[in-house]
């Protein structure tokens, strides 16, 4: 399956390190800046309240994320001359790929939630204070948000960097950059920072193995959505207003619960990310070994 990702790398025509490293970084920075600026006029246009914006339920949130995704695709295809297929948007089995990613993302977050709960590190409160239309609206927002972040770090930068510095250094570098965009998040801890880095490694390894952005995008979406709006944990330090349940950290058990950064700062999440990464590395090595015998 790694052959799919390798075809993306091999099909990149440019051999200039400037075009393969500096240009993609500048394009990515531009896209991130535009993503942040877009929300301002859209909030005024839709007249969203501060509560709607902070809860990701505003129309401005959804529209800005959708525009950012399509703008990213447009700039990447025009400036770096990549096709949507090279960006990981495989045209084969789109629904199946997305559902697989959604399943694995759901399994991952619920596993962490249940383990933390069984270790008595959180108290669970059923609140169900999220109206169905807002629930759907927030889910759609995170569909775009998951794909947006994944196209930046996996779909675009990953094959470009791999062309120059190889896959191993690329995964480390992109995981570091992925961590950097979370540095300003509130309640950040060293374990939280480590886990964000490990999540970057996990997503990169899965994308390297599958070459499928639909799958990793769905995993990213369901992780964030269920974490914040179903089980009610903090999402990378950001509290949520609406949820079905609320997970309140038990005092003195922050190492297990993640405290006010959320499950992403939990030692349980550390172990899970390491386990998933090692399993994907095993699958990659198994595939490579099989290819050598052919």
Where in the sequence are the language-model features?
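C-terminal membrane module of polytopic membrane proteins
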Residues: 226-294
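Juxtamembrane helix-loop-helix connectors linking adjacent transmembrane helices
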Residues: 2-8, 40-60, 82-151, 158-163, ...
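Hydrophobic core of alpha-helical transmembrane segments in multi-pass integral membrane proteins
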Residues: 25-36, 69-75, 106-114, 270-285
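Functionally important transmembrane alpha-helices
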Residues: 34-37, 192-254
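Hydrophobic alpha-helical transmembrane segments
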Residues: 21-26, 63, 98-103, 135-136, ...
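Membrane-interface helix/loop boundary segments of multi-pass membrane proteins
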Residues: 14, 148-173, 205-212
């Amino acid at each position: 399956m790694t052959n799919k990702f390798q075809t993306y790398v091999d099909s990149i025509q440019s051999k200039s390190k400037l075009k393969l490293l500096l240009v993609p970084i500048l394009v990515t920075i531009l896209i991130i800046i535009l993503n942040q600026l877009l929300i301002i006029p859209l909030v005024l246009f839709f007249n969203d309240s501060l509560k709607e914006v902070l809860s990701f339920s505003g129309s401005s949130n959804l529209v800005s994320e959708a525009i950012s995704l399509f703008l990213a695709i447009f700039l990447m295809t025009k400036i770096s001359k990549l096709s949507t297929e090279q960006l990981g948007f495989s045209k084969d089995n789109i629904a199946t790929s997305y559902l697989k990613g959604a399943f694995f993302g759901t399994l991952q977050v619920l596993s962490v939630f249940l383990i933390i709960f069984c270790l008595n590190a959180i108290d669970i409160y059923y609140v169900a204070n999220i109206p169905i239309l807002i629930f759907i609206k927030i889910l759609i927002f995170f569909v775009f948000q998951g794909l947006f972040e994944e196209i930046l770090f996996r779909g675009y930068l990953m094959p470009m960097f791999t062309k120059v510095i190889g896959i191993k250094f690329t995964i480390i570098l992109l995981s570091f950059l992925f961590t950097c965009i979370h540095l300003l998040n509130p309640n950040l801890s060293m374990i939280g920072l480590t886990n964000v880095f490990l999540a970057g490694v996990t997503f990169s390894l899965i994308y390297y193995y599958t070459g499928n952005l639909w799958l990793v995008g769905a995993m990213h979406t369901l992780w964030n959505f269920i974490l914040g709006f179903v089980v009610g944990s903090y999402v990378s330090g950001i509290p949520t207003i609406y949820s079905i349940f609320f997970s309140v950290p038990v005092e003195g058990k922050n190492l297990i619960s993640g405290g006010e950064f959320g499950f992403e700062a939990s030692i349980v999440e550390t172990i899970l990310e390491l386990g998933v990464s090692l399993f994907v590395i095993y699958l990659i090595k198994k595939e490579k070994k099989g290819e050598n015998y052919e």
